[in-house]
């Protein structure tokens, strides 16, 4: 399943790359977290965006959700992922892939609890013009 998600993300990214020559830059997603748009293409009412996200040791994404589905591949490091119940819903090591569903009912947090940068390749499939993420309040967890 993980290989299938990675193949889908890579295939979609290659298709998007073939369809566009523009390269956009993104701003950091939060304290210590950086993001760089590698490829962006709009088809119909959807934006397909391939982005590299780097999370330094001890940092995280902050609580958030997405307006569209995301497919991520862990290029480096280990990502610890938590849902709104404060439970870990996955620990993703280098070479792993994950899917994040859309909607405010899927609030989550990604953290780097390791000693090296986490580097993700993320394919965002968003409604046209939607932001990468929507900030959400801490759902009552003892960590941020």
Put a short name on every predicted segment.
Residues 104-131:
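Ligand-binding loop in jelly-roll beta-barrel domains
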Residues 1-26:
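Secretory targeting and sorting signals
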Residues 67-81:
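Short, conserved beta-strand element in jelly-roll/cupin
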Residues 134-144:
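Short, low-complexity, Pro/Ser/Thr/Gly-rich segments in the mature regions of secreted, periplasmic
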Residues 30-62, 123:
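A short glycine-rich, His/Asp/Glu-containing loop-to-beta-strand
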Residues 64-66, 81, 106-108:
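Histidine-centered active-site/metal-ligand motif
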Residues 65, 73, 90, 112-117:
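Extracellular/periplasmic catalytic domains that process cell-envelope and extracellular macromolecules
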Residues 43-45, 55-57, 79, 83-105:
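Short acidic-glycine-tyrosine-enriched beta hairpin
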């Amino acid at each position: 399943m993980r290989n299938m998600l990675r193949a889908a993300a890579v295939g979609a990214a290659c298709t998007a790359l073939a369809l566009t020559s523009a390269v956009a830059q993104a701003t950091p997603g939060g304290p210590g977290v950086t993001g760089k748009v590698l490829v962006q293409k709009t088809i119909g009412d959807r934006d397909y965006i391939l982005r590299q996200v780097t999370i330094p040791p001890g940092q995280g994404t902050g609580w958030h959700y997405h307006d569209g589905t995301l497919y991520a591949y862990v290029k480096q490091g280990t990502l610890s992922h938590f849902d709104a119940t404060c439970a870990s819903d996955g620990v993703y090591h280098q070479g792993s892939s994950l899917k994040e569903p859309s909607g405010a009912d899927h609030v989550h947090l990604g953290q780097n609890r390791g000693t090296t940068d986490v580097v993700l390749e993320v394919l965002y499939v968003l409604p046209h013009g939607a932001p990468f993420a929507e900030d959400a309040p801490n759902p009552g967890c003892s960590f941020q």
